[in-house]
Amino acid sequence: MKKRPIVLCILDGYGLTSRVEGNAVKLANTPNLDDLMSIYPTTVINASGEPVGLPDGQMGNSEVGHMNIGAGRVVYQSLTLINKAVKEGTFVKNEKFLSAIDHVKENNSKLHIWGLLSNGGVHSSNEHIYALLRLAKEQGLEKVYVHAFLDGRDVAPDSGVDFIKDLSAQMDKIGVGEIASISGRYYAMDRDKRFDRVALAYDVMTQKKGETFTVPVQYIRDSYANKVYDEFVIPGSNRNTDGTIEDNDAIIFANFRPDRAIQMATIMTNPDFYSDKGYVPEVRRNNIQFVCMMKYADSVKGDIAFSAMKLDNTFGDYISAKGLKQLRIAETEKYAHVTFFFDGGIDKEIEGAKRDLINSPKVATYDLQPEMSAYEVKDKLIEELDKDEFDVVIVNFANCDMVGHTGIIPAAIKAVSVVDECVGEVYEKVSSLGGTMLITADHGNAERLLDEEGNPFTAHTTNVVPLILTNTHLALKDGGKLGDLAPTMLDLLGLPIPNEMDGESLILNNETCLV
């Protein structure tokens, strides 16, 4: 019997809003999605805030989105858990933080705080950095240095100067801390093994090699004057501090999201790990007490301050146990999301699951190649579907998010159009096989590229995302959330929803098993 696959198609960063100005989703030519929305059951679902386990009003992101989708439940996120610890006072009693502080005291050394200095809430929170400074002060430390990674992606591209001002004000108020270095996240938080980027930030922190400054705010302003904004600010060290990382120091990495923290943390704690990829750091620091906010990866050798919500019986595990075959496919930028994050933040092999990784193009920024590798993802997916092997497919098209982050509207418009073209071809193939597509997104981005004043807006949004079900015999409920997608797929597969999932099927009138 031929397979009739269920294909979950995630259009990363494809949100919905009525505003047209700066809205690449509305400005792009999208005949395929327009037709699908007019023909098939369509609704909108929540992808931000409390429905996905974030604080109220907090924009969603790819990690959060895919974890909620794969778990089939509301997944309370790292940001929420750590905020709760700060509020309830358990943050300052955290054993891993206190162990790092004891290490500093015993060695008469320095405490370094790494982190994305931003209130974006995607990778970090500046409030957590301030909480660490307060803890250091309470514990009597004097040599405390912040290595600030500038955002400009999940927040306004030129907001870094204000975050640095606020950090300086907090240091003055608390009575401890100096800014030791500044780096755009493009360098310090690379995740694609572009070691030339990472090395610039690492060498600044460990050797004061490269650019230097004496006034942090002026360093950023000078960068702005050269049209280089937060994300891309060249790493530089403060000549007026003794903030170089040395033997016997301690480091607390305040980022809670793993994917863009792994490389830098691995290089510091496990310096030979990337030797087979052609990179080892120029200098190694010994006897470093290293603390991650959350678990990053096994390659990172250090303590973990907080444990993530344990997710049993995720969608992938559940359908595997039922004997179904599944395919996960995405290009590099979103591969971790359809595997690691979709599986509950665990990198694991699942029986009956195949993974296809399509390399993302090697360009500086994706506005230079808005199509990214979407056509290759689409072609490989169609090739896989022709094999008649898979009951379920999870595919991610990265373009709307990754190009949306550049803030370049014409490029984002092209990105949306390319995704539409690919969705159209995938739909034709799935339809020819008698299968069903669920087309949705993990969060918004490309639909808002200008703020209210007409300035570039490069962050994610709190807007709803679409859900299209390509079956005219069914209807969809309104008011859903990302955590309802796994139960919805199980409903389509004719499988019961496991107790671990608190999401609900969004199908109103399903009486037949489709697979």
Regions found by a protein language model. Name each.
Residues M1-V515:
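Feature captures the catalytic ectodomains and active-site-proximal regions of enzymes
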